[in-house]
């Protein structure tokens, strides 16, 4: 049995390991558009010397349930518990102060969003909560600190359906684990073990941009660059943004259910920047995450210093704010953040070393992680809620994986892992049966 995998992220790597464990598999070809393993798990180790800046996935979530915990241990990657607290940084009559995220006015907004979610999630096609009529600091903070806000979902509460989030599996309640050398480095190291452990059965093709997938009942033929590859089955793990914009042509066209799913499954926006500090500012305590409102474009920065790397200041933006920042030159974004943080905090000075992400403009990603968009229709319309399962359904010998196909923990690395494993098991079952 000869199988192709498109995409070298966590889903593709998990699929490869699962397939290669079966003695009936004679060849596994992994085609990756970039020159590396990892997908949206990517660590930058050069922009800030001595610091591993995770540009995508930040940490191992639900460590007792997440396969990456065991992989990190096996590959000798040290981890550190997050153990974070969260605070607001606000300007008051007495100057700048650090306040609890449960400030009454902010908590009232959070409670409103929760009540809206509780009610709206009873129907399959209703948004979490409406867009605020006025964009004021209290509203920005409320949406930023809500568990349904953009820092969790990469989309705003008025952009995605509540019922999709309501299916999310309960986590283990344990602290997230930072990977000291970077979670992207961990995933890359895991992928790089495939060839040494599998010999000639495994072939990796980096820089292979797949442009067409032709399939029938018995085989799949991939076209990439000026080459083609025919296999017994193919697992597609590329992001829904790439599938949805027609970058890969399917012959014949995918069924209506898949095409409709790709209209509502989208990638949100999430942005990170990191700057090396020249000083150790007393207003930014390592291990504390602070929320700081920005006026133009309106949004919220989430910034912090890591206990194990307290000489670097990291800032996040999400949702519409991140999308607006992604449209600006990097130099303007750095200037915007530096001006704001130095206004809000004393003693913040920077030295050489900085890094920034822009997933919106990454050709192989075109966004952060998935959400199920509200695109209209009545509250009882079931189609959007069916999108993740619809996309995960095989089409003859073509199988789909990736975090967007997992309803229970979408948007996470473990979702990508489980989906890749699931698709590989389905390939083995179906081809053996045939």
What are these regions (language model features)?
Residues 1-434:
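FAD-dinucleotide binding site
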């Amino acid at each position: 049995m000869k199988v192709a995998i498109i995409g070298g992220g966590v889903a593709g790597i998990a699929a490869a390991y699962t397939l290669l464990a079966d003695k009936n598999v004679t060849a596994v070809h992994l085609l990756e558009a970039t020159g590396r393993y990892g997908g949206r798990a990517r660590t930058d180790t050069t922009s800030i010397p001595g610091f591993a800046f995770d540009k995508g996935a930040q940490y191992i979530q639900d460590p007792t349930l997440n396969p990456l915990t065991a992989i990190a241990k096996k590959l000798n990657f040290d981890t550190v518990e997050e153990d974070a607290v969260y605070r607001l940084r606000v300007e008051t009559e007495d100057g700048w102060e650090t306040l609890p995220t449960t400030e009454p006015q902010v908590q009232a907004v959070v409670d409103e969003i929760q009540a809206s979610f509780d009610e709206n999630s009873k129907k399959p096609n209703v948004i979490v909560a409406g867009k605020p009529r006025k964009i004021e600091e209290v509203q920005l903070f409320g949406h930023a600190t809500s568990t349904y806000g953009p820092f969790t979902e990469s989309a705003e509460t008025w952009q995605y359906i509540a019922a999709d989030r309501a299916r999310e599996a309960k986590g283990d309640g344990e602290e997230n684990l930072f990977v000291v050398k970077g979670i992207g480095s961990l995933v890359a190291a895991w992928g790089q073990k495939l060839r040494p452990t599998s010999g000639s059965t495994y072939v990796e093709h980096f820089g292979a941009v797949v442009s067409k997938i032709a399939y029938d009942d018995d085989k799949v033929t991939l076209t990439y660059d000026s080459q083609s590859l025919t296999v017994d089955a193919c697992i597609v793990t590329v992001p829904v943004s790439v599938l949805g914009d027609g970058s890969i042509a399917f012959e014949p066209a995918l069924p209506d259910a898949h095409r409709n799913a790709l209209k509502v499954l989208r990638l949100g926006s999430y942005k990170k920047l990191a700057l090396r500090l020249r000083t150790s500012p007393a207003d930014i305590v390592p291990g504390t995450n602070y929320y700081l409102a920005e006026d133009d474009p309106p949004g919220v920065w989430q910034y912090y210093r890591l206990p194990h790397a307290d000489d670097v200041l990291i800032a996040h933006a999400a949702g519409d704010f991140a999308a607006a920042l992604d449209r600006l030159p990097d130099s303007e974004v750095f200037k915007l953040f530096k001006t704001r943080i130095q206004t809000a905090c004393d003693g913040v000075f920077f030295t050489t070393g900085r890094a920034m992400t822009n997933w919106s403009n990454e050709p192989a990603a075109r966004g952060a992680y998935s959400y199920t968009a509200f695109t209209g229709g009545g509250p009882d319309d079931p189609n959007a809620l069916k999108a993740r399962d619809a996309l995960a359904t095989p089409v003859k010998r073509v199988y789909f994986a990736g975090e967007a196909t997992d309803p229970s923990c979408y948007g996470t690395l473990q979702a990508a892992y489980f989906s890749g494993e699931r698709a590989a098991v389905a390939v083995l079952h179906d081809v053996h049966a045939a």
